[in-house]
Curated annotation (Swiss-Prot):
InterPro entries: ARF_dom, ARF_plant, AUX/IAA_dom, B3_DNA-bd, DNA-bd_pseudobarrel_sf, PB1-like. One of its GO terms (molecular function) is DNA binding. One of its GO terms (cellular component) is nucleus. Keywords: Auxin signaling pathway, DNA-binding, Nucleus, Transcription, Transcription regulation. One of its GO terms (biological process) is auxin-activated signaling pathway. PANTHER family: AUXIN RESPONSE FACTOR 12-RELATED (PTHR31384:SF164), AUXIN RESPONSE FACTOR 4-RELATED (PTHR31384). It comes from Arabidopsis thaliana (Mouse-ear cress). Auxin response factors (ARFs) are transcriptional factors that bind specifically to the DNA sequence 5'-TGTCTC-3' found in the auxin-responsive promoter elements (AuxREs). Could act as transcriptional activator or repressor. Formation of heterodimers with Aux/IAA proteins may alter their ability to modulate early auxin response genes expression. Gene3D superfamilies: 2.30.30.1040, DNA-binding pseudobarrel domain, Phosphatidylinositol 3-kinase Catalytic Subunit, Chain A, domain 1. This is Putative auxin response factor 14. Interactions between auxin response factors (ARFs) and Aux/IAA proteins occur through their C-terminal dimerization domains III and IV. It is found in: Nucleus.
Length: 605
C-alpha cells in the first residue's frame, strides 16, 4: 500500500471504522497502539499537516521532501474530511498503523459519520510487560491472578491440577493455542504449552508487552506491543521508496487540485499530524504565549502514561521551507530531565495549558527538586529547619563534623550560588529571620552543661564527672564565619552569636542576585561582581535559562529588576555600577507580560 495513492473515483463508503473487522479487533488494536494513540473520527473535519506526514519517512529523504515544498508552493495545513479509517498491523513486526482516507473539505460529498449508538459489547483486557522468565525458552507466561480471573476462561478448581486449553486470535487472524494451568508452590496461573511457539514466532524479548482481550461471549484475542527502542520509522513494506521520496506532497497537491481522495498512513507513536478542526481552533484561541506553563503526555519505558512540565520560551518555524506553520512551532524548556526522549519544539495541540503556579505542576516539580537538593546539600542545611524540627539529634550530628567537612560543605553552597534566600525558596520552611535561635540553643546548652551526679556510665564514659560541652551550633557558626571572612577579606574574625552568624552569612553572599523567569518555577542566582556590564549579564542569563540569544534579540523577552525600594524597572537604563548597587532581584518577562505590567503601572516606563 502506498501512502500517496490518489483515488479518482469515490468508493462505497462505510459507516463504521474498518467494517470488515469486529469491535473486538478494534479494542485489541487500540491497546496494542498504546495510551497516546489518537485516531480521528469518521466524518470529522480535520487539518492535515504534510510536515508531520514527512516525519514518518526515513531521515535520509526528509531534506529532499522539504526542498519540494517551495516548488509546489503548498500550504502548511490542509482542511479535510475523514472518509474512511482502516486499522491495520504490519505483517513482519506486528506494528500497528492506520490507513486514513482524506478528502478536501467540500459540501458536495455526503460524508459518512460513525454510529455512536452502535452496540458496544463489554470487554475485559490486561497488558503485561514481559520479564526474562516470560521469554525464556524453558519457561512459561505467568499471568497475575486478578487478570487470569477477569480475562481468561475460568478453570475447574476442583481438579487436582486445574488445566484447560485456550484459543486466542491475533490481529492477523491467526489462531494460537495455549495450555492454561494453575500450579506451583506459589499457586500461579501459567500459560505453558504453545507459549514458546508464540514468543518465537513473534520474536518477543524482555520489555515487550503482551495484550489479552476477552469479550462477553468468551472470545479471546491476543496482541503484542514492541518496546519503544524497537520502534523504527514507517516500514518500507507499507510505503514504497518512490512514495517516500516523491509521493507525499505531490499526491496531496494533486488531490486538492482535483478534489479527490487520498490515503495517508498514520502510526500511533508518531506526532499527531491529523488534527481535529475543533481542537485546532481551541488551540488558536488559547494563544500559547512565551512564558506560558504547560504539561505534555508521554509514554514511559514501562508503557504507562507520563506527564512532563515545561515552559514555552519561543515561537518559530520548525522548517525554513514551511513559513508560518503551526507544526512544532513552540520552543520549549523542560523542568527536569527524563529517561525518555522529549522534543525541543512541540505543536500547540500536543500540550495542555497550565495556569501560573498550578498546584499540579508546582508540587510535581518541587517534589523532585526537593529530593535532589537535599542530597546535594546534606546535613549542612539542617539549620534552615524550623525549631520544631531541629532537635538535639540533628545538632549532635553537625557537631561531629570536622572543620574540613564544614569548609567543603560551605564552599559547595557558595560556589553553586546557593544563597540562603534561594535555599529557603526550595523548602516549605519559615524564613531564617523569623527563627528564634536562642530558643533552639539555650535548652540544649542547659541540658549538656548540667552536672550529672548519679553513678551511671554511657558508652564507657562516667556520667558522674561534671563536664561542659561547647555549643555545637556556635562552633559551626564560628567556622563558617572564619572561612567567609578569610575568603573575602583575607582576615579572621570571630562571630559570637547566632544573630551575627545569620547577618554575616547574608552579607557575605550579597553579590549573588536572585533571577526569576516567567513560567519557571525555580529561580537562579547570578554573581554581578564578576560581570563587567549589561552584555555579560545578558549572556549569563541566557546560559542560566538556556535561551540561546533570545534575550539579546529582545523580540520575545525583556529583563527587569527591582531596587531596594521595591520599584520595578527595565534593565539597561542605569549606569552599570549604579545598577549593581541598587538591584535587589532580576526578572525575565515575556513581551506580553511587560505590556500588562506597564498597563497596571507596576513597571516604570
Amino acid at each position: 500500500m502506498e501512502s500517496g495513492n490518489v483515488v479518482n473515483t469515490q468508493p462505497e463508503l462505510s459507516g463504521i471504522i474498518d467494517g470488515s473487522k469486529s469491535y473486538m479487533y478494534e479494542q485489541l488494536w487500540k491497546l496494542c497502539a498504546g495510551p497516546l494513540c489518537d485516531i480521528p473520527k469518521l466524518g470529522e473535519k480535520v487539518y492535515y499537516f504534510p510536515q508531520g506526514h514527512i516525519e514518518l519517512v526515513e531521515a535520509s529523504t526528509r531534506e529532499e521532501l522539504n526542498e519540494l515544498q517551495p516548488i509546489c508552493d503548498f500550504p502548511s495545513k490542509l482542511q479535510c474530511r475523514v472518509i474512511a479509517i482502516q486499522l491495520k498491523v504490519e505483517n513482519n513486526s506486528d506494528e500497528t498503523y492506520a490507513e486514513i482516507t482524506l478528502m478536501p473539505d467540500t459540501t458536495q460529498v455526503v460524508i459518512p459519520t460513525q454510529n455512536q449508538n452502535q452496540f458496544r459489547p463489554l470487554v475485559n483486557s490486561f497488558t503485561k510487560v514481559l520479564t526474562a522468565s516470560d521469554t525464556s525458552v524453558h519457561g512459561g507466561f505467568s499471568v497475575p491472578k486478578k487478570h487470569a480471573i477477569e480475562c481468561l476462561p475460568p478453570l475447574d478448581m476442583s481438579q487436582p491440577l486445574p488445566t484447560q486449553e485456550i484459543l486466542a486470535i491475533d490481529l492477523h487472524g491467526n489462531q494460537w493455542r495455549f495450555r492454561h494451568i494453575y500450579r506451583g508452590t506459589a499457586q500461579r496461573h501459567l500459560l505453558t504449552i504453545g507459549w514458546n511457539a508464540f514468543t518465537t514466532s513473534k520474536k518477543l524479548v524482555e520489555g515487550d508487552v503482551i495484550v489479552f482481550v476477552r469479550g462477553e461471549t468468551g472470545e479471546l484475542r491476543v496482541g503484542i506491543r514492541r518496546a519503544g527502542h524497537q520502534q523504527g520509522n514507517i516500514p518500507s513494506s507499507i510505503v514504497s521508496i518512490e512514495s517516500m521520496r516523491h509521493g507525499i506532497i505531490a499526491s496531496a497537491k494533486h488531490a486538492f487540485d482535483n478534489q479527490c481522495m487520498f490515503i495517508v498512513v498514520y502510526k500511533p507513536r508518531s506526532s499527531q499530524f491529523i488534527v481535529s478542526y475543533d481542537k485546532f481552533l481551541d488551540v488558536v484561541n488559547n494563544k500559547f504565549n512565551v512564558g506560558s506553563r504547560f504539561t505534555m503526555r508521554f509514554e514511559g519505558d514501562d508503557f504507562s502514561e507520563r506527564r512532563s512540565f515545561g515552559t514555552i520560551i519561543g515561537v518559530s518555524d520548525f522548517s525554513p521551507h514551511w513559513k508560518c506553520s503551526e507544526w512544532r512551532s513552540l520552543e520549549v524548556q523542560w523542568d527536569e530531565f527524563a529517561s525518555f526522549p522529549r522534543p525541543n519544539q512541540v505543536s500547540p495541540w500536543d500540550i495542555e495549558h497550565l495556569t501560573p503556579w498550578s498546584n499540579v505542576s508546582r508540587s510535581s516539580f518541587l517534589k523532585n527538586k526537593r529530593s535532589r537538593e537535599v542530597n546535594e546539600i546534606g546535613s549542612s542545611s539542617s539549620h534552615l529547619l524550623p525549631p520544631t524540627l531541629t532537635q538535639g539529634q540533628e545538632i549532635g550530628q553537625q557537631s561531629m563534623a570536622t572543620p574540613m567537612n564544614i569548609s567543603l560543605r560551605y564552599r559547595d553552597i557558595t560556589e553553586d550560588a546557593m544563597t540562603p534566600s534561594r535555599l529557603l525558596m526550595s523548602y516549605p520552611v519559615q524564613p531564617m529571620a523569623k527563627l528564634n535561635y536562642n530558643n533552639v540553643v539555650t535548652p540544649i546548652e542547659e541540658n549538656i552543661t548540667t552536672n550529672a551526679v548519679a553513678s551511671f556510665r554511657l558508652f564507657g564514659v562516667s556520667l558522674a564527672t561534671p563536664s561542659v560541652i561547647k555549643d555545637p551550633v556556635e562552633q559551626i557558626g564560628l567556622e563558617i564565619s572564619r572561612l567567609t571572612q578569610e575568603k573575602k577579606f583575607g582576615q579572621s574574625q570571630i562571630l559570637r552569636s547566632p544573630t551575627e552568624i545569620q547577618s554575616k552569612q547574608f552579607s557575605s553572599t550579597r553579590t549573588c542576585t536572585k533571577v526569576q523567569m516567567q513560567g519557571v518555577t525555580i529561580g537562579r542566582a547570578v554573581d554581578l561582581s564578576v560581570l563587567n556590564g549589561y552584555d555579560q549579564l545578558i549572556l549569563e542569563l541566557e546560559k542560566l535559562f538556556d535561551l540561546k540569544g533570545q534575550l539579546q534579540a529582545r523580540n520575545q523577552w525583556e529583563i527587569a529588576f527591582t531596587n531596594n525600594e521595591e520599584d520595578k524597572m527595565l534593565v539597561g537604563e542605569d549606569p552599570w555600577p549604579e545598577f549593581c548597587n541598587m538591584v535587589k532581584k532580576i526578572f525575565i518577562y515575556s513581551k506580553e507580560e511587560v505590556k500588562n505590567l506597564k498597563s497596571r503601572k507596576s513597571l516604570s516606563s
